[in-house]
A protein has these predicted regions:
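Conserved nucleotide-binding/hydrolysis micro-motifs of P-loop NTPases
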Residues: 41-43, 111, 144-147, 174
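Structural beta-sheet core signal
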Residues: 36, 83, 105, 139-141
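Beta-strand-loop-alpha "switch" segments that mediate conformational coupling across diverse proteins
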Residues: 145, 155-185
């Protein structure tokens, strides 16, 4: 069984698709048999990844039944499934959490973003109680501007939420440029160098692997 990594939040505009596309491409380029599941009706991540990595498998699943039926089946065929969930805590999002091993929760540095991620953590907790364990929730602080008070408050608040956090991503033009050009930050040359270093370091923290003892998928923080 492959590792199912969900990108979810109760608010849009927090960087779900940016992380999903780059994570899927990074896993693929690291030699993992990878597919993207686009569960967002807007289809932004699937369109972006189709341009950036046309050889990488993509599935569009739009309903809770499709998620619950197809994701476990796909997980038997791939090492890693990256699921880009819809904005909001809909039944589709809840279905995604019922089949994911890991839930990445991007969060921007605003009061609304913090409220949204707290609600997302609550819903992840519901899925954990139903399943008796997974998915593990991990925060991804995003659009950081370290010199600003809101970013400093976000980073301080993250420590109080009871959920582990990755190193975070700064607000960088390279991420917007990659989306607009249908490419990846590591293909932007010098313009994308800082963003590339940051996002690949963030992914390396996940330690995505399969246990040799029982072949169970897992993703742990380093």
């Amino acid at each position: 069984m492959g590792t199912v990594i969900a990108l979810t939040n109760s608010k849009g505009g927090v960087g779900k698709s940016t992380v999903a596309v780059h994570l899927a491409a990074w896993c693929h380029q690291c030699g993992r048999h990878t597919a993207l599941v686009d569960a967002d009706a807007q289809g932004a991540s699937s369109a972006w990844l189709h341009e950036a990595e046309p050889d990488l498998a993509i599935a569009r699943l739009q309903t809770p039944d499709e998620i619950l039926d197809q994701v476990p089946r796909l997980a038997t065929q791939y090492d890693v499934l990256v699921v880009d969930g819809p904005a909001g805590l809909s039944e589709v999002t809840r279905a995604v959490l019922l089949v994911a091993n890991l839930a990445l929760l991007p969060c921007g540095p605003s009061v609304l973003d913090l409220r949204a991620v707290q609600e997302a953590i609550r819903v992840v907790g519901q899925a954990q109680r139903i399943r008796g364990g997974p998915p593990q929730a991990v925060l991804v602080p995003n659009k950081l501007q370290v010199q600003y008070r809101l970013t400093q408050e976000l980073l301080a608040t993250v420590q109080t939420l009871g959920v582990p956090a990755l190193g975070g991503l700064r607000l960088r033009q390279a991420f917007a440029d990659a989306a607009g050009q249908g490419t990846l930050v590591w293909r932007l040359g010098l313009r994308g160098a800082a963003a590339t270093e940051e996002i690949t370091r963030l992914f390396a923290e996940l330690n995505i692997h399969e246990s040799e003892a029982n072949h169970e998928p897992s993703a742990t923080l380093s």
